Amino acid sequence: MELIDTPYYLNETHKHIEKVLSFNDTNVVNMQLQIGQTVAEHEVDADVLIIVKRGKVIFTVEGREVEVSQHNLLHMAPGERHSLRAEEVSDFMVLQIKR
């Protein structure tokens, strides 16, 4: 068992992106963004799960916009091009799982 802290950094910094765990073919990344911050379009050679702990993030996946919050979960297949924009101050987990 391993309990991993994911502290809130946005009181101290403008943006925070950190890989917090890597095992087998899985990476777990904590992203914390201020309102309006973006991540440019890219793709990942893995299944991607987005789990929002705080805030609201707009993902554009293959041209389609979806709002991700604490009330839902986003799955993207390997190779799906996507970008994102924080609609609110946001703290979320990104799980990249290679097939």
Locate predicted features:
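Short, conserved beta-strand element in jelly-roll/cupin
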Residues: Q32, V44-I58
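Conserved short histidine dyad/triad with adjacent acidic residue
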Residues: V28-V44
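Ligand-binding loop in jelly-roll beta-barrel domains
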Residues: P78-R99
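A cytosolic small-molecule/anion-sensing beta-strand core signal
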Residues: K53-R54, S69-Q70, E88
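A short, N-terminal "cap"/entry segment at the start of jelly-roll beta-barrel domains
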Residues: M1-D25, T60
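Short acidic-glycine-tyrosine-enriched beta hairpin
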Residues: G63-P78
